[in-house]
């Protein structure tokens, strides 16, 4: 039996079976048939068993071969010519055409080869990207680009990079085709973020024109001469802590609470040049060397407290050693030989020689408490250190030798900041005793003192937690930072601040706009309870004085009482009034029955929405209450009309009287909770925004739907506003985007993406309806110009 199993006929059958699927000729099918016939005549029992097992698959193979043979006879009469760009499927091609298609030739050289350019380097070139980009943000096919496959792939990668970095729009249209657009006109920056008992770092460029500081998750570069002009960097994912200009003035290095340092272009488009993980904790300070090549960043980490790197590659150029607790400050000598100094909570000042930077010596017997600031003088001859023990120590900038202590007993609080004058003969300090002092190095005493805040008051908000003496200026200006976030412009020789720049430190949660005597004013409230008014023409802000809300401001509304009155509600469950002309709180707070969901005002009536009712106020006093059949989420008013939105997606339109609301119509607006409402200027239409990002418009007269096509937002609608003519609606959302919608052409809109980091909280029209202002979680107020509305 074993001989029969390995007979020649069986071997031929096995060989034929192994070649099934590889042969597609008619000869192979004939050989297979002969092998099958030969095997069937074999008398061996084992061979018959093997035959029966393989019979079904063999028959199927033979049938497939027969079908293929018949189809080839028809191919002669079904030839088809294909051109480049035709839509086809592989099974449409004959074998001959498939071979021809597979032999198509690609160009050996193309435009990039001729010009010796790398397509990957072209991602910044808008003209090149536009030439090779389709209207849907994709690269054009090779039949149109004429590129080699390698360069085609490289250019596609460059295009994806440009879109990812925001250099190219994902849906591209040439500028001449764009009929309407929205662009930033000005950014009214947030105030620096501060923490009680901690220093806040300020930095100025070499020309003394711009100020850099950290606020929330952004970095702001602010004009010193015109604080209404600013630039915002938003690439950090965590709370930002420090920002420093490079001596060259072309780059900024910034750190955050996650231990990340980012280096970015501060002259061009703000492109990030590098991102480096320094410590696994908070970055407290960083410093550049005089060549703008090396950075030392320090903070609070578990494995190390700082690191030295090159800004362009992140390569290590030294180690930070000699400390046992977190570091608060660092400085690098700008002259050679390079020196560096660090200090922190371990009360020790450590000197390094570089580069690469290595430990040289540590001084632990001078300060008796935390050290908050060290800085080399511009000429490199001195080093000064200050701290929570209220002491000021001077050292030799080259050797680290201690020169002595000055100003003992002058400051009555922790010294949080120090900065040198450009002549290296004087420096300035900022302290928690509310004072800023200028010191003469040679005399060893203070030459001028400013006391910030009200006379005789020791308000915590007036603690001075940071200071910078901008170089390159001829007016002897220095800038100090209060714990409240106010920037104080101080000029040597003058007793009072020349200017105080105010703003918001926390997320702006509410916005209202008023116009009195053709002067437009914005009113903003923030998460920490601060309310400010802004001059739209100049972009300057003033904080409202008096006893306000201790926390979250949930809404602002305007009435025509007297010379104008602003009403505010907060999460302290109170409603308060503000005299618009005096810019101060008036009267006492009125207690609400529950947490406010929103506030709106008619001519003289104020409505405060709560979960179970709408409270009615006149002249600061409660006059009535309206119980709703649903849980109220928002409220709007215009003249004698009011609208209440509910958790169930319904909107109730009511008439306002002095003490009650009279229902007029019920609208089933959405399946989702209503989040925002706005009446048109003539009260003929009502715009409705819901929790899922939809915006709808209804007629007030009969509740009929006008449009439900405005669905581009992807998160809760936080604010809606009509332009003065009632033709367009602007919407803001937690998705960070702003849209301008056309009532006449519901399918047309203008989009502004990433208007505010982490969400837009308020929008309004200004300057006659040609510009928009917005506020958001980044604590900034931004003005946008809208062109070509239809």
Regions found by a protein language model. Give the residues of each.
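N-terminal mitochondrial targeting presequence
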Residues: 1-49
């Amino acid at each position: 039996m074993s001989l029969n199993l390995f007979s020649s006929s069986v071997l031929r059958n096995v060989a034929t079976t192994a070649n099934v699927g590889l042969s597609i000729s008619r000869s192979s099918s004939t050989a297979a048939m002969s092998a099958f016939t030969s095997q069937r005549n074999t008398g061996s029992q084992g061979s018959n068993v093997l035959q029966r097992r393989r019979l079904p698959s063999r028959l199927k193979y033979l049938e497939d071969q027969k079908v293929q043979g018949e189809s080839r006879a028809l191919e002669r009469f079904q030839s088809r010519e294909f051109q480049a760009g035709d839509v086809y499927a592989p099974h449409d091609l004959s074998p001959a055409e498939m071979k021809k298609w597979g032999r198509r030739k690609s160009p050996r050289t193309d435009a990039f080869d001729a010009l010796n350019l790398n397509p990957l380097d072209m991602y910044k070139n808008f003209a090149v990207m536009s030439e090779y980009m389709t209207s849907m943000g994709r690269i054009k096919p090779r039949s149109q680009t004429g590129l080699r496959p390698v360069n085609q792939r490289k250019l596609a990668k460059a295009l994806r990079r440009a879109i990812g970095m925001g250099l190219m729009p994902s849906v591209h249209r040439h500028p001449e085709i764009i009929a309407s657009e929205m662009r930033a006109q000005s950014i009214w920056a947030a105030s620096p973020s501060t923490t009680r008992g901690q220093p806040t770092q300020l930095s100025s460029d070499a020309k003394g024109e711009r100020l850099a500081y950290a606020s929330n998750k952004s970095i702001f570069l602010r004009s010193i001469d015109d604080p209404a002009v600013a630039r915002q960097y938003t690439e950090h994912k965590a709370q930002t802590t420090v920002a420093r200009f490079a001596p060259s003035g072309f780059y900024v290095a910034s750190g955050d609470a996650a231990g990340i340092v980012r280096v970015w272009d501060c002259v061009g488009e703000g492109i990030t040049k590098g991102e480096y993980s320094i410590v696994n904790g908070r970055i407290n300070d960083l410093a550049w060397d005089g060549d703008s090549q090396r950075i030392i960043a320090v903070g609070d980490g578990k494995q190390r407290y700082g690191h030295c790197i090159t800004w362009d590659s992140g390569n290590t150029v030294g180690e930070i050693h000699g400390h046992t607790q977190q570091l608060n400050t660092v400085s690098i000598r700008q002259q050679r030989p390079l020196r560096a100094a660090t200090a922190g909570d371990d009360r020790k000042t450590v000197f390094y020689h570089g580069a690469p930077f290595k430990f040289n010596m540590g001084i632990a017997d001078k300060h008796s408490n935390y050290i908050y600031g060290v800085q080399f003088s511009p000429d490199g001859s001195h080093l000064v250190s200050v701290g929570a023990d209220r002491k000021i120590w001077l050292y030799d900038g080259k050797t680290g030798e201690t020169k002595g202590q000055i100003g003992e007993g002058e400051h009555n609080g922790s010294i949080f900041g120090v900065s040198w004058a450009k002549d290296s003969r004087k420096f300035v300090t900022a302290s928690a005793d509310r004072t800023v002092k200028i010191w003469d190095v040679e005399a060893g005493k203070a030459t001028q003192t400013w006391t910030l805040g009200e006379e005789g008051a020791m308000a915590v908000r007036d603690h001075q937690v940071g200071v910078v003496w901008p170089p390159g200026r001829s007016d002897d200006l220095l800038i100090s930072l209060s714990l409240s976030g106010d920037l104080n412009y101080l000029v040597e020789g003058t007793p009072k601040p020349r200017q105080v720049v105010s703003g918001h430190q926390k997320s702006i949660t509410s916005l209202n706009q008023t116009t009195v005597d053709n002067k437009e004013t914005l009113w903003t409230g923030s998460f920490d309870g601060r309310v400010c008014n802004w001059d739209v023409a100049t972009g300057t802000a003033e904080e409202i004085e008096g006893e306000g809300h201790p926390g979250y401001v949930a809404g602002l509304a305007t009435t025509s009482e007297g010379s104008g009155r602003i009403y505010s509600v907060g999460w302290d469950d109170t409603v308060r009034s503000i005299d618009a002309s005096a810019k101060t709180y008036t009267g006492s707070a009125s207690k609400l029955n529950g947490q406010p969901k929103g506030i709106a005002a008619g001519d003289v009536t104020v409505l405060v929405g709560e979960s179970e009712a709408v409270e009615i106020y006149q002249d600061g006093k409660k006059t009535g209450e309206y119980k709703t059949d649903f849980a109220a989420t928002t409220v709007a008013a215009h003249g004698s009309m009011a609208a209440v939105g509910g958790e169930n997606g319904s909107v109730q339109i009511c008439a306002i009287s002095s003490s009650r609301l009279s229902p007029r119509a019920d609208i089933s607006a959405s399946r989702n909770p209503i989040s925002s409402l706005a009446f048109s200027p003539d009260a003929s239409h009502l715009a409705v925004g819901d929790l899922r990002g939809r915006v709808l418009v209804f007629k007030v007269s009969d509740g009929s739907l006008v449009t439900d096509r405005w669905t581009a937002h992807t998160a809760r609608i936080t604010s809606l506003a009509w332009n003065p003519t009632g033709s367009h609606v602007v919407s803001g959302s937690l998705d960070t985007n702003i849209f301008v919608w056309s009532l006449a052409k519901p399918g047309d809109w203008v989009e502004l993406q990433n208007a505010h980091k982490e969400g837009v909280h308020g929008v309004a029209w200004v300057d006659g309806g040609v510009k928009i202002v917005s506020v958001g979680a980044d604590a900034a107020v931004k003005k946008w110009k809208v062109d070509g509305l239809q």
